[in-house]
Swiss-Prot record:
GO terms for molecular function: NAD binding; NADH dehydrogenase (ubiquinone) activity; NADH:ubiquinone reductase (non-electrogenic) activity; quinone binding. Residues 196-581 are annotated as: NADH dehydrogenase I subunit D. It is a peripheral membrane protein. GO terms for cellular component: NADH dehydrogenase complex; plasma membrane. Its EC number is 7.1.1.-. The gene is nuoC. It catalyses: a quinone + NADH + 5 H(+)(in) = a quinol + NAD(+) + 4 H(+)(out). InterPro entries: NADH_DH_suCD, NADH_Q_OxRdtase_suD, NADH_quin_OxRdtase_su_C/D-like, NADH_UbQ_OxRdtase_30kDa_su, NADH_UbQ_OxRdtase_49kDa_CS, NDH1_su_D/H, NiFe-Hase_large. NDH-1 is composed of 13 different subunits. Subunits NuoB, CD, E, F, and G constitute the peripheral sector of the complex. NCBIfam families: NuoD, PRK06075.1, PRK11742.1. This is NADH-quinone oxidoreductase subunit C/D.
Amino acid sequence: MSAVELVNELSARFGEAVFGEQPTHDAFPTLWIKPEAMPALHRYLKHEIERPFPLLVDLWAIDETARHHREGQPPSGVTIASHLMSLERNADIRLKCALPADDPRAHTIAEIYPNADWYEREAFDMFGVHFEGRRDHRRILMPPLWDGHPMRKDQPARATERPPFVMTAARFDAEEQALAVDPEALGLPTQRDGVELMILNYGPHSMATHGVFRIVLALDGEEIVAARPDIGFHHRGAEKMGERQSWHQYIPYTDRIDYLGGVMGEMPYLQAVERLCGIAVPERAQTVRIMLCEIFRIMNHLLFYGTLAQDTGAMSPVFYMFTDRERGYRVIEAITGARMHPGWFRIGGLAADLPEGWDALVRDFLDWMPARLDDYEGMVMRNEIFRARTVGIAAYDTATAFDWGITGPGLRATGCGWDMRKARPYGGYQNFEFEVPTGHRGDCYDRARVRVDEIRQSLRIIRQCLDHMPAGPIKADHPLTTPPPRERMLHDIETMIHHFVGSSWGPVVPVGEATGQVESVRGLTQYAVVSDGETTAYRTRIRTPSFAHLQSIATIAPGLTVADLVAYLGSIDYVMSDVDR
């Protein structure tokens, strides 16, 4: 069934509840629906339609009150957008609801897509959207006592535009009390079989939480009866920043969403912007981008490998693997001039060409790693203690992964071989040969196994980049390539003015909406950007895998021991900046 046939089927089945298709720069349809039809439409797409859409990729909001260009769209004060994916069809669909600005109300779909729970809480927290049918509306990223909804257009983007913040003793006490655990508010049981349960704050300062992150546990001895993850301690307003930084200036911020993914975080953002601009990236720039992304994938997976071993009791591997990572960072630094956050990709290409001698550095790294991985196989993956701590622990199946929006290695560990680089090749990945590692139990061990095998596949991709690096330009010959090539400046005063404006203010990106999707180190990372024809984005939405993955703890943790929880958290491989943004 094509996208057109899908739209026609939904229109025929739901009649006036589906009242318009919006043109975008994406390869999937965007439909406007009536708010009261949200539950029925989502239920049909998940459970009833042939070849269903089992994965809710994202649910987000747009404050439309300051937007000038909404041609072909119904009147809306606040728009709710849900993004669904069907792996069987290899297709997506986005549904939008128009809500009033003064009292936006939609209908919950959390009973249909369980992972909608946190997305709905975020829409309430950031935009003030209420969802009929929810048990509660608690903030998720902002402090409990925060006043207002910061992503609304009437809220300032800079701290200097707000009144001075003063932490009085009374306010400190109130904020501290607001963070105290209320089992009833969290839906936590306090007794089981007549025995009182211990309520424990696990974090936010525990080493095992891998960041500032709290899980409220209900414990019967060492057994976890219930768990409620609590996030937001690391929130920095990354999406709000996207509304005040120019399209070009925002690139360094994308490195810091998943601060271990490096340039890989730049890819989906630039995909979306380049799609809006109609820019085709040159083949050499594409290949260099892929090579650096795969080096960063190895850097991340080595850190995961060593820290998971450390979480389960092995101290030596993490030190060996940091030595390997240092070799990789030498390559990255030689090429980009930076280590963890290069900010090196550009709209339409790269910041610079490859330096002299880059190939020898890459070849040395490729020759170094395979033997090291062989050593780690015996040191970690075949280690009996490691296997005892991970095999059969925190297992889930593919259906559970879909319910909670789990993608990447966490999904592939269940036996589902979905990888965006293979299923929907982007940025030149269609030119490379590699395998997609999968597991079969979906437990901690398989999640580690998949990532270890991915290191070898990334080495294989990098080798192909090294052996077949094309010649040619590193920037697209396009008026919106940023910064514009200097060669275009050195003609007359007019070309100099255009170069100055493009380099200082940044490009004016055409009106429209576009989405970029990549297989990042943790799973599906997605940027949805809205342009109103300005030098900044009207809306920048960031869908991160870690946010979805942590939500699943409430379902998967019960029945584990506290020691098992340590292994489970390590096997998720999340980064709190990726969660909180």
